[in-house]
Every structure is written in C-alpha cells, then in structure tokens.
Curated annotation (Swiss-Prot):
The lineage of its organism: Bacteria, Bacillati, Cyanobacteriota, Cyanophyceae, Synechococcales. CDD domains: PRAI. Keywords: Amino-acid biosynthesis, Aromatic amino acid biosynthesis, Isomerase, Tryptophan biosynthesis. It comes from the Bacteria. This is N-(5'-phosphoribosyl)anthranilate isomerase. It catalyses: N-(5-phospho-beta-D-ribosyl)anthranilate = 1-(2-carboxyphenylamino)-1-deoxy-D-ribulose 5-phosphate. NCBIfam families: PRK01222.1-4. Pathway: Amino-acid biosynthesis; L-tryptophan biosynthesis; L-tryptophan from chorismate: step 3/5.
Length: 218
C-alpha cells in the first residue's frame, strides 16, 4: 500500500529540512491569518528555498473562505504547487479554483461533525483532486487534535484519492491505518511542540510506525 504523508503547519526552515530528510516531502503551510500556525508568503518561500529540489515535491497552502483574487495574489508570491481549501467552499467555487489554477493540485477538506456529513463528499467528486476528512471544531479549522470515528469511515471509498486527518499521532496512526486505507494522511498538532513548532523526534516516531506497517510514500 503506497500512501502520501503530509506534515502540515510548518514555519521553520530547519524543521522542514529535518522532516524532508525523514522522507516526508509533502509539506503544508497555513495561509489563514486567524490561525496560530499562519505563515506569510515570504516565510513559506524561506522554507522552500532551504530545501533541495529533491525535497520540494509538494508544497500545499491551506486556505479558508478566501476570494479567488486573494488566492491568486498569494499564490503569485510563492512556489506552492498545491491548494487546500479548509473552509465552507462550495463545489462550484472549487471548480472555479481548479479552472483558474490548473497546475495546482486541489484538495478540499470536509470537517465532519457527524457521520451524515460524509454525504456532502459526493458533490465534490468532480470538483477537486483530493478529499481530506478532518474532525469538526466550532472555533478551529484544523490542528485541533480531535480524531474522527474511524470505524464509521470504513465504507468510505470515493472515486478519487482521499486523505485522513484529525488528531493523528505517532501513537495512534497504526490503529487508524489498520481500520482504514486512505490514500494519504495529514498530521499537524500530533507532531508538534506548539503551533507551527514541529517536534522532529515525533516525526521520526511517525516514520518508524509507518515503516512497521510497510507503508511507503509515493
């Protein structure tokens, strides 16, 4: 089973280098100003410039309820090659983003409050490249540390790649992946010491747990 692993909420170049050296080269940057993990376009470029070409495989900016012009303005200032929409974006808006930025991989996060929320996923099947399932929090868009009810997701098999997020840590990732077969996983608070301050030792523990499951990145 090949699986992509995204480490999200990066800010510090040295931490990004260490994480990439562990084999995790899908990196996420929070571009939502209200978030404690927010990074500016300049900070993102400092991180990406610190990485070798080999380790720059996928740099994803996380946005929420941003206008198309504002999104374009931010993307023009960075070398991001992926867009993650983590707010209340409609399928139609996602299609507009995909049309405006066809070279960027488009990920839509669905924050699940209840199992029935999964029904919303179908409307996005032909609008995005990847679906990401995250836990709902009334005040935070992500990085909440809250997990999803994994057993209730076992029948979720959309016709496009999907990633699992929500409270994943080195301690519980094996349990989650024994129950589910996502195409990717997304970790933030589970591998950090504080907002945007990644714990490289925890990332190394994550690598060891995934190696034990013989899960390789693409």
């Amino acid at each position: 089973m090949a699986m992509e692993v995204k480490i999200c909420g990066l800010r510090h170049p040295a931490q990004a280098q260490a994480i990439a050296a562990l084999g995790f080269t899908t990196l996420g940057f929070i571009c939502v100003e209200a978030s404690s993990r927010y990074v500016s376009s300049r900070e993102i470029e400092l991180v990406l410039q610190s990485l070798t070409a080999h380790n720059k495989r996928s740099a994803i900016g996380v946005f929420a309820n941003v206008s198309l012009p504002k999104l374009g303005e931010f993307l023009a200032q960075t070398s991001l090659n992926g867009i993650q929409l983590h707010g209340d974006e409609s399928p139609d808006f996602c299609r507009q983003v995909k049309q405006a930025f066809p070279q960027h991989r488009l990920i839509k996060a669905l924050r699940l409050r209840r199992s029935a929320d999964l029904e919303r996923a179908e409307a996005y099947y032909n609008a995005v490249d990847v679906l990401l399932l995250d836990a709902y929090h009334p005040e935070q868009l992500g990085g909440t540390g809250q997990t999803l009810p994994w057993q209730k997701l076992q029948q979720f098999r959309p016709p496009l790649p999907w990633w699992l997020a929500g409270g994943l840590t080195p301690s519980n990732v094996q349990e989650a992946l024994n129950l589910l077969q996502p195409d990717g996983i997304d970790l933030s608070s589970g591998v950090e010491q504080g907002p945007a301050d990644k714990d490289v030792a925890k990332v190394a523990q994550l690598r060891a747990q995934l190696d034990a499951l013989a899960i390789l990145q693409h």
